[in-house]
């Protein structure tokens, strides 16, 4: 495949992630949409690194994956805690200022 194809795929994945984040009111779906956007950014970084013959993009993608893994741990812990106390993962139904 041509590197442009990978960049187009990255842009499409990022757009799907943005649409999913902005239109869905479920916290899990919004969380997965953010992860999809991070993976699209990783694909673009690796593609640029391959085109330029450098490892900088791959190293950047590696650090993005590390941050994404930490985000998954913290984000899912927060979502599970909210679900246990509120019995819903809807963003609209959850008001954290009121106990």
UniProtKB/Swiss-Prot annotation:
Single GO MF annotation: quinone binding
EC number, UniProt record: 7.1.1.-
Key words of the record: Cell membrane, Membrane, NAD, Quinone, Translocase, Transmembrane, Transmembrane helix, Transport
Domain of life: Bacteria
Function: NDH-1 shuttles electrons from NADH, via FMN and iron-sulfur (Fe-S) centers, to quinones in the respiratory chain. The immediate electron acceptor for the enzyme in this species is believed to be a menaquinone. Couples the redox reaction to proton translocation (for every two electrons transferred, four hydrogen ions are translocated across the cytoplasmic membrane), and thus conserves the redox energy in a proton gradient.
Subunit-structure text: NDH-1 is composed of 14 different subunits. Subunits NuoA, H, J, K, L, M, N constitute the membrane sector of the complex.
NCBIfam families: PRK05715.1-2, PRK05715.1-3
Stated name of the protein: NADH-quinone oxidoreductase subunit K
Origin species: Cutibacterium acnes (strain DSM 16379 / KPA171202) (Propionibacterium acnes)
